[in-house]
Regions:
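Predominantly soluble domains enriched in secretory-pathway, periplasmic, or organellar proteins
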Residues: 1-242
């Protein structure tokens, strides 16, 4: 349901995929990209008199993540969706959702170097420092920096972070991506400017961290912090980001 922020009235009930998991605004603010757990991506035009779907695509059988390109000069040029099954991500035309490049995520685990045949794509965000998507692969524990500046000659930087990556969000500078490795009770900090792992935060992290995007605010004592809640306990942990 799309609700008018002023009148609080329902403007339209838009047909989407099953159990919408993620909603992402386009850089322009005109379009809303949503993905259901059934891997259906909907492109909704919010500037129409009655906002509704203008494009729909199924990228697989099960999915969790979608986003659009945000780097200067590439704003909304591309969209990306990551799927649980098949284990892959799909780069699409940002205006039409036409699939342009499909890449499998099968590979080796970061710790034991064992081959994993079906590692699921968890959270995806778009870098503000480079023309790259940050793609987190759950079972292998790899964070992929996918360079979309030339998708016909795709370049991917693979950062070994931690296994069982799930959701996460930017710190306040949008340089550092804070992603939960939930079954390892760890927060991995990835530098999206230098493309490297900065730190694995374990001290103080509770059981099964599940931040969503997390929350950034300035603590009066500790300064800038990023906060996460947990599925396995009732704690909220603050991580300093200055």
């Amino acid at each position: 349901a799309l609700i008018d922020g002023d009148t609080k009235k329902i403007i339209n009930i838009v047909k989407t995929g099953y159990a919408v998991h993620i909603s992402r605004m386009s850089h322009s603010g005109r379009y809303l990209y949503v993905i259901g757990r059934d891997a259906q991506v909907n492109l909704i035009d919010l500037w129409m008199k009655k906002p509704d779907n203008v494009a729909v695509i199924k990228t697989g059988l099960e999915a969790r993540s979608v986003d659009t390109s945000k780097y200067k000069g590439y704003e909304d040029k591309y969209a990306i969706a990551g799927t649980y099954w098949p284990p892959q991500y799909t780069i699409m035309n940002g205006d039409t959702l036409e699939p342009l490049k499909i890449v499998a995520t099968r590979g080796y685990t970061v710790d034991t170097q064992e081959y994993h045949p079906e590692p699921r794509v968890a959270s995806i965000v778009a870098s503000h420092f480079k023309p790259e998507f940050v793609v987190n692969v759950k079972e292998t524990g790899q964070t992929l920096m996918v360079d979309y500046s030339d998708i016909n000659n795709l370049k991917v930087t693979t950062i070994g972070t931690e296994r069982f990556l799930h959701d996460g969000g930017w710190d306040s500078s949008k340089r550092y991506f804070m992603v939960a490795a939930n079954q390892r009770n760890t927060i991995a900090v990835v530098d999206a400017k230098d493309n490297k792992l900065v730190k694995l935060v374990t001290e103080g992290v509770g059981k099964i961290p599940h931040p969503g995007r997390g929350a950034n605010f300035v603590d009066p004592k500790h300064g800038p912090v990023w906060a996460t809640s947990h599925l396995g306990d009732d704690s909220v942990v603050l991580i300093g980001t200055d």
